[in-house]
């Protein structure tokens, strides 16, 4: 163990540009210590001012133009520390809901009250329970299910939340969960669904659109979206080679591709709204468009009620 005096003498424990500021965060490129004022969030970790300048020097004209167009406005992010508080909070709440769901006797009742089942939106089947449209994102079928979803949420959220700001990120997540549930009601009205996959795909969709808008390389994101969306179909196809029934095989995979699709589409729309209304004076327009999108999503729920029930 090092003594306090040894700690103070070690310059690696302080920002290289501000020697009086203690920090333990390193630039991902040059590995120099940087304080909160000197760090710029990157796809992985943070970048110091010098490395950021070098990166901008190698940007293409299109990327520079997109960056100027984005940064001309007031910063979207309101998280000065860069800590993804909303992301961590969502993970904590979801984890707590999963733990409660494991409690004998009580857990099953609570999980059943939170899961989404489209008939609960139809008056003739009993009291309407609209909260299920959102709370299904809190319920997971097993440790692997919640583990993969929360891992994806962490990797995307820690990069996307500082860019959008906490409240925009939360709105995106909730609308993604809503979009996934609406898609299930439209495309699989007799299916019970649980999980945050719809909301996760919404984050992917928003990241894809916003990344394209600022001139970032979105190929990796696009590939990840394609792989995650396609894999239940691939598994079902392989399984159907022996059974001959692709539809039944797809249903037995246990993955709601409908929720994935709904979340992805809604996330892309929200990302487009954020990218197009980033100016401070456009905030009323942004809020209005988000409200309009929410109304449209709830309005779409009339279709399964009329068609299926």
Which residue ranges define each predicted feature?
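Canonical RING-type zinc finger of E3 ubiquitin-protein ligases
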Residues: 19-30, 37-41
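Long, low-complexity, intrinsically disordered cytosolic termini of multi-pass membrane proteins
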Residues: 1, 8-11, 20-22, 34
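A detector for small-residue-rich transmembrane helices and their helix-helix packing motifs
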Residues: 2-6, 32-33, 37, 41-309
